[in-house]
Amino acid sequence: MTAANARLLTTLLSLAEDTGSLSDELHFAGRDATERDPLDHGAANVLRALVLPKAPRVLEVGAGFGGLTRYLGEVAATVHAVEADPVRAAAVRFRTRGLGTVTVHDKLVVETYDLVVVQQPYATRNLLDWVRERLSPTGAVVVLTASRGVAGTLAAAGLEVQRELLCSPGHEVARAVRGARIDTELPRLSAAIAGGPANGLALLCGPGAAALWPPYRLATYFNTAERAAFACTRADVVRTGEGAEVRRVPLVPSPPVAGISVGPCADKVYDAPTMVEVLLDEPERVAELLTGWRDLVREEAARGVEALWDLVPHNVLVDGATLRPIDLEWRNAGAGVSEVVERGVLVLADKLADAGWPAAADGGSMRDLAGWLGVLIGLHPSFVDGALEREVAFSTIGSCGTEHGTDEVRGSIAEIWRKRLARTVHEYRSTKAGAGVAANEDEVAKR
């Protein structure tokens, strides 16, 4: 990072009204990855994924711009953040202002610590020897790194790695944190939540390392990217007596915004493809699966399922002859069966068009595809316009966390949708699965 970027980030932090670890103000302030990563909702996800000691005394070595420091200050009794660079140290002070738990230093402070967090560049033998001597009897060390090379230095300092966690895409802004066992036990789910290579590691050391990551937990992943804080969630993949389960919860309890909210949900893990994946491989099943999904929506509504809004085809597993809903976290108080069915068809058309679905008509647009899919289950093709309007409104709320002052964002999302509806399916194929899908609640309002 250049000195100019560092000064800009420090200035942004000095001017921000909300410097919390889930600050929307900061999350959406960065212009590029260099600026965004230190301000991201997910900057502290690697620590959110851990079971930290209750009211710990924490030492952080290499505080950077305070993304981890802020979170630690919100959950710990005492945090000593060490940052030698004066510009970054100032940034940490701005990020943690108002927290009586945090003090920022330019050198190590001699105390006893329950948790020590070390960034890789500082993980030298001398530092690690010093840290080992100042760990409490149940203390733990977390080293954040992009390389396993530091493991030898840790071992030489008497801090053998007790557990290695993979961070995707990296530890700086981790969307998924997982142990290696999930790759062999649940390979389909592991690939889905990782979304690509793991370029970061969290190495857990010390006598208290095992408690940071319980043996029953396989992975933790987050939806914090393009959502307002009220809609950010975490999901823990845990072993159960019957296999494994995904348990989702909001990161912060929040009231609905214009009837939109997220809530907890739990799903048993099945080794089965989603409805979208099946349709990409077996397009001839489209009428069968669409009809089955529509009937499933009706059945779940009759059972009083609260999160009906999320019951769309990419959240349905095809487990043999059984359709199984998963990941039902979004609630929309204004939506009933017809609105959910129309939404599901619209979003399905977008995902199939994104993949250049071979069963789409030659020369046809995504709008044409959505209309045709709708006809298969009794919808008039004109449903697209109403479904689009609702999806834009939903995406705007999910991204902004408010219904006020959002005209610019709403207009941008609507324009993205108009362009996608107009594109010719067979002339378009994303270079990345799911890239740019404005309907996906994790990718709304790219701005």
Go through each PLM region and give its residues.
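N-terminal auxiliary segments of SAM/dcSAM-dependent transferases
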Residues: 1-19
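Conserved alpha-helix/loop element of class I SAM-dependent methyltransferases that forms part
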Residues: 37-56
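Conserved class I S-adenosyl-L-methionine
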Residues: 55-64
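Conserved SAM-binding loop of SAM-dependent methyltransferases across substrates and taxa
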Residues: 65-76
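Class I SAM-dependent methyltransferase SAM/SAH-binding core
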Residues: 75-101
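A short glycine-rich, Lys/Arg-flanked "PGG" loop and its adjoining helix->strand segment in the class I
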Residues: 126-137
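Rossmann-like AdoMet/SAM-dependent catalytic core
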Residues: 167-243
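Catalytic activation segment of kinase domains across protein kinase-like and atypical kinase folds
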Residues: 303-358
